[in-house]
Design a protein with these regions (language model features):
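Glycine-aromatic micro-motifs
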Residues: 1-110
Length: 110
């Protein structure tokens, strides 16, 4: 049985509702959130990299299933381009939330 309570922080293409609908076949609500200590950059794809004092604005996607994460892992080319790791973000209401994030492999800093 799938876990339907997975949370993912997104900061690039997956912030687009149409892209999420195309990939997952259903609407996923996104709530504003921030990731402290990371700056967003872009080469061929968006990425975040550790940077003291930086804040990356993005969104948290809640109610994702294990199946959804597998689809998104494939889309993000895990483990070639990204890894899916746990991280803490701050929601718009100030709550600290532990969630998944896609972090780049070496391509972003090379």
């Amino acid at each position: 049985m799938d876990n339907d309570n997975e949370i993912l922080f997104v900061y690039g293409t997956l912030t687009n509702p149409a892209e999420r609908m195309r990939l997952l076949g259903r609407a996923i609500i996104a709530s504003p959130a921030q990731l402290a200590g990371y700056a967003r950059g872009q080469k061929r794809y968006y990425f975040v990299a550790k940077q003291s004092g930086a804040i990356t604005k993005g969104a948290i996607l809640e109610g994702l299933t294990t199946r959804d994460l597998k689809i998104l892992d494939n889309y993000e080319e895990v483990p070639t381009l990204y890894t899916r790791d746990r991280i803490e973000v701050v929601a718009a209401d100030g709550a600290h939330i532990e969630c998944w994030i896609y972090l780049p492999t070496d391509w972003a800093t090379a």
